A protein has these predicted regions:
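A glycine/proline-hinged amphipathic helix-loop "lid/cap" segment
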Residues: 1-57
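Alpha/beta-hydrolase superfamily serine-hydrolase fold, recognizing
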Residues: 10, 41-181
Length: 181
C-alpha cells in the first residue's frame, strides 16, 4: 500500500494542488505502514486553542503524559499520520500521548511552532485525558523536525524558568538547520 502511495505522490505534477495536498498525501503514507498497527483509543481535545488528540491504550496511566511532536520538516505532518505510532508508544510506555497540530511553515514562521509546543506542554501539565489534573510524570518526544522541536521547546522552557519535562526523547532530531550540516 505504501508503494502505491509513493507512486501516486511522485506522479503528481500539478503545482496547483499545493501544500494542503502534499500534507494529506504525506499523512496517507505514514498512516499506511502495515507494521505499525493502531491500538487503543484516540479522541480530540482543544489544547488552549491548538487542535490535539489524546491517544491511550488500556495500560495508559492518565497521569503520565508524553507530548509527542510529529516530524515533517517543519512544513508537513499532522496528527492523522501519527495515530498508529502514538498508540504503539502509549502501549509500550504505559503513558498517555498528546499529539498536537502545531503551526507549520511556510504559512507561519519561527517561532510559532515552538510557541505552540510550549503552550501545549504547559497545558498538558494541568490537563490529562480525563480532564483537569496534574501529571505525575511529563515527557516531550518527537521525530525528525518534531525531535528538533522537542529539544528547542525544552531549552526555551528552561530559558523562561518554566517547569521542565522529566525527560526528553528525540528520535533522529533535525536539530541543526544550517544548510551546511
Amino acid at each position: 500500500h505504501q508503494e502505491d502511495l509513493v507512486k501516486t505522490f511522485f506522479s503528481l505534477d500539478d503545482e496547483r494542488l499545493g501544500m494542503k495536498h502534499f500534507r494529506y498525501t504525506n499523512d496517507d503514507f505514514f498512516s499506511a505502514d502495515e507494521n505499525i498497527k493502531p491500538t487503543g483509543t484516540a479522541f480530540p481535545v482543544n489544547v488552549d486553542g491548538i487542535y490535539g488528540q489524546w491517544v491511550m491504550t488500556e495500560n495508559s496511566d492518565p497521569d503520565k503524559r508524553i507530548l509527542y511532536l510529529h516530524g515533517g520538516g517543519y512544513a508537513i505532518g499532522t496528527i492523522r499520520g501519527y495515530l498508529s505510532l502514538a498508540s504503539q508508544l502509549a502501549k509500550k510506555t504505559g503513558c498517555s500521548i498528546l499529539l498536537i497540530d502545531y503551526s507549520l511553515a511556510p504559512e507561519l514562521k519561527f517561532p510559532h511552532g515552538i510557541n505552540d509546543c510550549k503552550k501545549a506542554f504547559s497545558w498538558m501539565l494541568d490537563n490529562g485525558p480525563n480532564g483537569q489534573g496534574k501529571c505525575t510524570k511529563s515527557f516531550v518526544s518527537g521525530d525528525s523536525a518534531g525531535g528538533g522541536l522537542s529539544l528547542g521547546v525544552t531549552l526555551s522552557l528552561k530559558d523562561d524558568g518554566s517547569q521542565l519535562p522529566d525527560a526528553v526523547m528525540s528520535l533522529c532530531p533535525w536539530a541543526e538547520l544550517d544548510p551546511v550540516s
